[in-house]
C-alpha cells in the first residue's frame, strides 16, 4: 500500500510542527503509492485533535478535519494550543490505511522583540523566533508585526517596550504616551490611551520606565516624569496607576529593578534628588528605607551622580554612580526585605576602558557585570583584578543597547544569553551571545540577526 516516506518540516523535526497564530502553512508529504496506482486512487485526510481536550466524560470536544487533500494548505485561525495531527492515506478500493501522527503546535508570536523605526520616524516591532529561546523557533524574524495587525499603521516617537500579563497588555511607550496592544493579538486596544491607564490627570506625559513583577501580589510600577505610579493588583478595586508618593519628595531615576525572590518588596527605584534607594512593597506602597553597615541605602554620598541601576543575582540590586571627576563605583544591596542588607561597595576605576562605558547590565545567575563601550563589551567578575574582553561588534557598528535574556521558566538558558543591538548608519543588527552563567565568560557562540532600522529597544516576550 501507500508509504508516507516523509513530511518535510515535520518528520525531519522530531515529528513536531510548530506554526504561528494567523500563519498560512503548507505541508507537502512525500508519498510512494502502490505500484499501478496514482494519487487519484486514494483519499487523504488531515485529522486534528487537541492534546488536552476540554469537557467531561462522554462530552469532550471533538476532533476536526483540516483538509481532505494530498497536501495541506491551511490558514491558521485558532488561538495558541497543542494538538495532534494525523495525516491519513486510504486506498479507495481496498480500504488499506497508512497514517503519520505528529505534534501540531500553534504558538503565540513570541520571542525576542525588537522595536525600531525608519529614517522617517515610522516605528514597528519585529519578533526574532530564536531557536534557543522559543519552542519551535526556527530563527525567522516576524517583521512589522504591529503594522500587520493594525491596518498598516506605524508608530511614532517610540521609546521602550513594556508588558503586563495581568491585563493582558503589550505597551510601546512613546513621547506621546503609549501604544497599547492586546498582548496576544498585537492589535491596539480600541479607544484606550495612555491617560486611561491612570486614576489621575498627568501634568506631563513622559513615560520613562515600566515593570510588572509577577511575584507576591503582582505589582506593576511605572515612572512618568520622575514620579512613581503603581498598581497593586491584589488590592480590591485597584486597576489603574496611582501616584504612590504619599508624603515622600523625590526625583525617580528612569529605572525599575524587579525583586524576584521571596520578601516584603517587589521593586527598587532610586531617588536622584536625595541619593537614596526607594522600594515598592508587594501591596504597592512606596518606602524610603535606611540601613547601617557598608553604606546607608537612604543616604548615598551626595557628591555622587546616578549612572545606571539593574537586577543582580539572588534578588540583589546593583547601582553604578560616578563622582565629580567621572570615576565609577558600584553599590550592591539586597532590598527584598523591609530591612535592607548592603552587600558591597566596589571601585570600578581599575577596569579597562570603563571610562568609555555607555551601557551596563548585571548577571542574574553569577556575580559579574557586562559593560560596553561603543564597539566592545567587557565582562567583570565582582572583585576581580581586571575585566575580560567579552565581545566586539563589526567594523563601523555602534552598540546602542545590550540586554540579558531573563525567563525564569527556561531552566537552561535563563540568564545565559546576552542580546546586543548595534547601529551602522540607519541599519540595525542584533547579536545573540551565549555565555557561562557562573563566570560571565563568552562560550564563543554568537548569532546575528539583521534587517532592522534604527533600534530603540529590545524585550523578551514568552
Language-model features: locations:
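Acidic/polar, low-complexity intrinsically disordered N-terminal segments immediately downstream
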Residues: 1-144, 410-415, 422-462
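Preference for solvent-exposed, low-hydrophobicity sequence contexts
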Residues: 142-153, 159, 164-365, 379-389, ...
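Signature of short aromatic-glycine-proline-rich micro-motifs recurring in repeat-based ectodomains
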Residues: 155-162, 168, 210, 399-407, ...
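Charge-dense, extended regions
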Residues: 318-319, 418-422
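Conserved blade-ending motifs and adjacent loop-strand segments that build the rim/top face
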Residues: 344-358, 387-411, 439-457
Amino acid at each position: 500500500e501507500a508509504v508516507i516516506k516523509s513530511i518535510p518540516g515535520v518528520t525531519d523535526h522530531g515529528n513536531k510542527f510548530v506554526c504561528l497564530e494567523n500563519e498560512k502553512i503548507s505541508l507537502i508529504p512525500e508519498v510512494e503509492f502502490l505500484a499501478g496506482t496514482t494519487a487519484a486512487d486514494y483519499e487523504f485526510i488531515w485529522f486534528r485533535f487537541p492534546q488536552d481536550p476540554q469537557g467531561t466524560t462522554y462530552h469532550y470536544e471533538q476532533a476536526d478535519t483540516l483538509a481532505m487533500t494530498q497536501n495541506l494548505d491551511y490558514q491558521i485561525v485558532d488561538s495558541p494550543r497543542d494538538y495532534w495531527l494525523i495525516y491519513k492515506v486510504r486506498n479507495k478500493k481496498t480500504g488499506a490505511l497508512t497514517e503519520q501522527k505528529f505534534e501540531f503546535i500553534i504558538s503565540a508570536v513570541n520571542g525576542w522583540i525588537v522595536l525600531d523605526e525608519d529614517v522617517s520616524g515610522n516605528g514597528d516591532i519585529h519578533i526574532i523566533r530564536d531557536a534557543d529561546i522559543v519552542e519551535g523557533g526556527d530563527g525567522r524574524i516576524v517583521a512589522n508585526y504591529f503594522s500587520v495587525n493594525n491596518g498598516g499603521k506605524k508608530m511614532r516617537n517610540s521609546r521602550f517596550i513594556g508588558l503586563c500579563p495581568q491585563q493582558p497588555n503589550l505597551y510601546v511607550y512613546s513621547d506621546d504616551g503609549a501604544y497599547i496592544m492586546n498582548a496576544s493579538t498585537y492589535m491596539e486596544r480600541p479607544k484606550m490611551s495612555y491617560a486611561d491607564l491612570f486614576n489621575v490627570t498627568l501634568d506631563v506625559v513622559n513615560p520613562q520606565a515600566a515593570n510588572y513583577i509577577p511575584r507576591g501580589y503582582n505589582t506593576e510600577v511605572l515612572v512618568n516624569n520622575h514620579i512613581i505610579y503603581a498598581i497593586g493588583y491584589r488590592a480590591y478595586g485597584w486597576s489603574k496607576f496611582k501616584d504612590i508618593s504619599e508624603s515622600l519628595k523625590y526625583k525617580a531615576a528612569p529605572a525599575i529593578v524587579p525583586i524576584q525572590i521571596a520578601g516584603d518588596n517587589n521593586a527598587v527605584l532610586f531617588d536622584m534628588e536625595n541619593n537614596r534607594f526607594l522600594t515598592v512593597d508587594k501591596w504597592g506602597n512606596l518606602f524610603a528605607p535606611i540601613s547601617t553597615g557598608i553604606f546607608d541605602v537612604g543616604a548615598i554620598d551626595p557628591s555622587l551622580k546616578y549612572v545606571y541601576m539593574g537586577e543582580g543575582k539572588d534578588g540583589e540590586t546593583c547601582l553604578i554612580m560616578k563622582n565629580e571627576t567621572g570615576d565609577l563605583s558600584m553599590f550592591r544591596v539586597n532590598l527584598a526585605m523591609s530591612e535592607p542588607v548592603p552587600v558591597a561597595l566596589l571601585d570600578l576605576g581599575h577596569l579597562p576602558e570603563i571610562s568609555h562605558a555607555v551601557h551596563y547590565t548585571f548577571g542574574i545567575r553569577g556575580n559579574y557585570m557586562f559593560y560596553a563601550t561603543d564597539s566592545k563589551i567587557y565582562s567583570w567578575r565582582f572583585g576581580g583584578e581586571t575585566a575580560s574582553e567579552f565581545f566586539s561588534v563589526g567594523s563601523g557598528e555602534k552598540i546602542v543597547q545590550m540586554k540579558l535574556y531573563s525567563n525564569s521558566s527556561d531552566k537552561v538558558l535563563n540568564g545565559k544569553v546576552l542580546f546586543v543591538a548595534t547601529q551602522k548608519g540607519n541599519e540595525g543588527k542584533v547579536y545573540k551571545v551565549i555565555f557561562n552563567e557562573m563566570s560571565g565568560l563568552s562560550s564563543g557562540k554568537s548569532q546575528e540577526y539583521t534587517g532592522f532600522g534604527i533600534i530603540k529597544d529590545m524585550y523578551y516576550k514568552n
